[in-house]
């Protein structure tokens, strides 16, 4: 083994030199230079500084504006709650630990931070899956003129919580475990060892199949079918400038959604699976740290893609921030945009509203 394993940690550094120390007790500057920890702390501070206001404002604006409290928007609120979990219970601990060069809060808080970071990340992931399914049902109409109501929205939110808990809770009860990862300043599931006492192998396979491959397939299928539907509607109305504009806007939004998903999860899943399938191989601490923080950044760019680029949400936010007046003069334009005459596909339905 080219790393050092303890009771509740795994350090990607051999202890042949005697330098390796518990990441709960000593700075880990033998893994990376101190300036890298400072950069990490500054980056987490940036995510907190921007991510908290954006996600909190989403919830506040929805309370202020009744027209936003629609079934199709419930999952967006769930996404904001998921991001706040990551910001409040994950990013804050990681920032302070990075300032000290190790996870200063101990093994119990490592479980706490790992649980809430995983819970928030998984809630966010499955919220994107539910959003994709919602858009597919509403726009592609595979079930005919299906009316999406509050009951369906509540079921979608409950589903995201169930799936998130099915991933975040097992390490707390003995199926895998939470360990400091990367530069040892944040915690996540154990991809690093095949410790039979925790059945790590089966848990990692379960996570990769159920919590990455399945969401990947569902999101690509739903948005692929959505694009086909929009293009077919546009082709049937080639003379309509509004239809062509709607097609371009919907295509842009779908591309951004898919890119956001790929940037967030593919690096993390790929590196984690590589480490798991190459037990004992050499890898640096930053090898796992960088992909993990791509995933954490989703708390910032998911709200930008799904909420701030939504015209209805954006106008309501501007109105709230400007004390009830929208200086852009678009207060009533957020209800619906660019509907096609045949399919009733709108940018607001996709982006979502």
Curated annotation (Swiss-Prot):
Its main location: membrane. PANTHER family: OPSIN (PTHR24240). Residues 1-36, 97-110, 174-202, 275-286 are extracellular. Residues 336-353 have a biased composition (Low complexity). Belongs to the G-protein coupled receptor 1 family. Opsin subfamily. The keyword Nucleus does not apply. Pfam families: 7tm_1 (PF00001), Rhodopsin_N (PF10413). GO terms for biological process: absorption of visible light; G protein-coupled opsin signaling pathway; visual perception. Glycans are attached at residues 2, 15. It is found in: Membrane; Cell projection, Cilium, Photoreceptor outer segment. InterPro entries: GPCR_opsins, GPCR_Rhodpsn, GPCR_Rhodpsn_7TM, Opsin, Retinal_BS, Rhodopsin, Rhodopsin_N. One of its GO terms (molecular function) is 11-cis retinal binding. This is Rhodopsin. It is a multi-pass membrane protein. Residues 330-353 are annotated as: Disordered. Phosphorylated on some or all of the serine and threonine residues present in the C-terminal region. Gene3D superfamilies: Rhodopsin 7-helix transmembrane proteins. Disulfide bonds join 110-187.
């Amino acid at each position: 083994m080219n790393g050092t394993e303890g009771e509740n940690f795994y350090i990607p550094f051999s202890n042949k030199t005697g330098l390796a120390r518990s990441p709960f007790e000593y700075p880990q500057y033998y893994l990376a230079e101190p300036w890298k920890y400072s950069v990490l702390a500054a980056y987490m501070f940036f995510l907190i500084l921007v991510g908290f206001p954006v996600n909190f404002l989403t919830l506040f604006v929805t309370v202020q504006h009744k027209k936003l409290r629609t079934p199709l928007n419930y999952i967006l609120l769930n996404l904001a709650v998921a991001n706040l979990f990551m910001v409040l219970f994950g990013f804050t601990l990681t920032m302070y630990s990075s300032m000290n060069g190790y996870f200063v809060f101990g093994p119990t808080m490592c479980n706490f931070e790992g649980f809430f970071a995983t819970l928030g990340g998984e809630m966010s992931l499955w919220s994107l899956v539910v959003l994709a399914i919602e858009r597919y049902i509403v726009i592609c109409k595979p079930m005919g003129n299906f009316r999406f109501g509050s009951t369906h929205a509540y079921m979608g939110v409950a589903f995201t919580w169930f799936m998130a808990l099915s991933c975040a809770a097992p390490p707390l009860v003995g199926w895998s475990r939470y360990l400091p990862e990367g530069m040892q300043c944040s915690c996540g599931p154990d991809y690093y060892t095949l410790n039979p006492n925790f059945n790590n192998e089966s848990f990692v396979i379960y996570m990769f199949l159920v919590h990455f491959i399945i969401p990947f397939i569902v999101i690509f299928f739903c948005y692929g079918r959505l694009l086909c539907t929009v293009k077919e509607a546009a082709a049937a109305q080639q003379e309509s400038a509004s239809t062509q504009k709607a097609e371009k806007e919907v295509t842009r939004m779908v591309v951004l959604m898919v890119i956001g998903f790929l940037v967030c999860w593919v690096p993390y899943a790929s590196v984690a699976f590589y480490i798991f399938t190459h037990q004992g191989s050499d890898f640096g601490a930053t090898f796992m740290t960088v992909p993990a923080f791509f995933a954490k950044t989703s708390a910032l760019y998911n709200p930008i893609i799904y909420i701030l680029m939504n015209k209805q949400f954006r106008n309501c936010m501007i109105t709230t921030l400007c004390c009830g007046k929208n200086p852009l003069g678009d207060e009533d334009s957020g209800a619906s945009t660019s509907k096609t005459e045949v399919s009733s596909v709108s940018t607001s339905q996709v982006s979502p509203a």
